């Protein structure tokens, strides 16, 4: 007979949610920073290009 799993505590749920939001905030900050640097021309970022796209052109 199937037995239900234990309920996850609110603390554990909140920790996971906080971690997820923190990681999302860091990625958003990196994306914004990259966008700003590209617009100002200070970027040293090189866009990766697929070899398949180069062959088509």
Curated annotation (Swiss-Prot):
Pfam annotation, one family: Ribosomal_L32p
Q: Which GO terms describe its cellular component?
A: large ribosomal subunit
Q: Where are the annotated segments for Disordered?
A: 1-21
UniProt keyword annotations, A-Z: Ribonucleoprotein, Ribosomal protein
Entry annotated with the keyword Ribonucleoprotein: yes
Q: Which GO terms describe its molecular function?
A: structural constituent of ribosome
Query: Is DNA-binding given among the entry's keywords?
Result: no
* GO biological process assignments: translation
- Compositional bias, Basic residues, is annotated for 1-20
**NCBIfam families, alphabetized:** rpmF_bact (TIGR01031)
The entry's family comment says: Belongs to the bacterial ribosomal protein bL32 family.
Query: What name does UniProt use for this protein?
Result: Large ribosomal subunit protein bL32
Q: Which organism is it from?
A: Rippkaea orientalis (strain PCC 8801 / RF-1)
